[in-house]
């Protein structure tokens, strides 16, 4: 089962909710899951200020400074769920495909032009929609629900805010299946 997330660079607090989950799944279900992180991007600039002179300089970010590197560490448990060889290749930040990556526990998908963004949904079976409880997130749209539905993907969503509008939990309290459910809703801990 391929479990994927796609989004932008402003979702660190949302993705931190997933911390520890890839490792627990990969330990208990070895070879049955793949986590797919879509949108990996190393573009960006950093502006630095010299404290003594007040002069500002702007430079390209280094790969390890990218928020996507932090996202990847969440999805790979700091590269523990992948082989050392694959982890080293990932941390070399080479664009392109790694041989056999479709069968590995984690897969990085580089950013694509906005006109082909939706094609990323073809790379996974289950869409993740974690969302941090915060007033800003409470009033967001349910875009992830709409995208998953449009692409006929199963959805695991946070039981919060915008996802409570259209999502009906497919599993009731106690584990009973809800035949009217359209999503797996997960409580924030």
Regions found by a protein language model. Name each.
Residues 1-13, 19-23, 35-36:
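Conserved donor-binding/catalytic core segment of Leloir-type glycosyltransferases
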Residues 1-3, 33-34, 126, 154:
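Charged active-site motifs of nucleotide-sugar-dependent glycosyltransferases
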Residues 25-32, 98-101:
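Short helix-capping segments at alpha-helix termini
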Residues 110-120, 125-149, 156-166:
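Nucleotide-sugar-dependent
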Residues 39-123:
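Nucleotide-activated donor-binding/catalytic signature segment of Leloir-type glycosyltransferases, i.e.
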Residues 10, 140, 184:
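Glycosyltransferase donor-binding loop in the core domain
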């Amino acid at each position: 089962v391929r479990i994927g997330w796609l989004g932008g660079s402003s979702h660190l607090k949302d993705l931190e909710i997933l911390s520890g989950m890839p490792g627990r799944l990969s330990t208990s279900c070895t070879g049955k899951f793949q986590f797919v992180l879509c949108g990996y991007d190393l573009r960006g600039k950093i502006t630095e200020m010299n404290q003594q002179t007040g002069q500002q300089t702007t430079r390209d970010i280094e790969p390890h400074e990218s928020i996507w590197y932090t996202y990847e560490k969440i999805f790979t448990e700091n590269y523990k769920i992948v082989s050392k060889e694959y982890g080293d290749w990932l941390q070399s930040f080479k664009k392109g495909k790694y041989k056999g990556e479709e069968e590995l526990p984690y897969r990085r998908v580089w950013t694509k032009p906005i006109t082909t963004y939706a094609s990323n949904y073809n790379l996974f079976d289950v869409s993740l929609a974690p969302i941090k409880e915060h007033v800003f997130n409470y009033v967001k749209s349910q875009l992830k629900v709409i995208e998953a539905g449009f692409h006929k993907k199963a959805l695991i969503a946070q039981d919060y805010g915008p996802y409570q509008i259209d999502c009906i939990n497919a599993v009731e309290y106690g584990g009973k299946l809800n035949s009217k459910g359209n999503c797996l809703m997960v409580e924030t801990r």
